[in-house]
Amino acid sequence: MSSAPTPHVAWFRLFQRGQIYMKTWPNEKRLAPVFPENRVTRATRFAIRFMPPIAMFTLCWQIALGGQLGPAIATALFACSLPMQGLWWLGKRAVTPLPPTLLQWFHQLRDKLQASGIALAPVDGAPTYQSLAELLRRCCKQLDKTFLDDI
């Protein structure tokens, strides 16, 4: 789905980048039809909060009712892996370079911010989805919501 190959990032570092990306992405309803991040972050937050207790409950429940240990452990491991899958996806997405259409919109947003007198740091290399998330967060705080009309 991405236009260019993503740079190699260490496995554990992807989870950290996923957490940072999840915290950075603005929770703006008008972005939801265009970007899947709103749905993925909501599902990942839910999974981080509720899946470990659900895993423990199902594990204890199956063992208490005399079930086999193998399927009980497999179910618990699957439930615990769901938040990790969300963070991994968000981490991969954070380091993915922007496709050409979003790249153009990214530069338009940067120009709007600079035209309104807001200082921005220069972009290092090719902009990624993390760069877009930081820019969108800044635009949501400092510009009116009409910048979302260009999506």
Curated annotation (Swiss-Prot):
InterPro entries: UPF0208. One of its GO terms (cellular component) is plasma membrane. This is UPF0208 membrane protein NT01EI_2692. Pfam families: DUF412. It is found in: Cell inner membrane. It is a multi-pass membrane protein. Belongs to the UPF0208 family. Keywords: Cell inner membrane, Cell membrane, Membrane, Transmembrane, Transmembrane helix. The keyword Transmembrane helix applies. It comes from Edwardsiella ictaluri (strain 93-146).
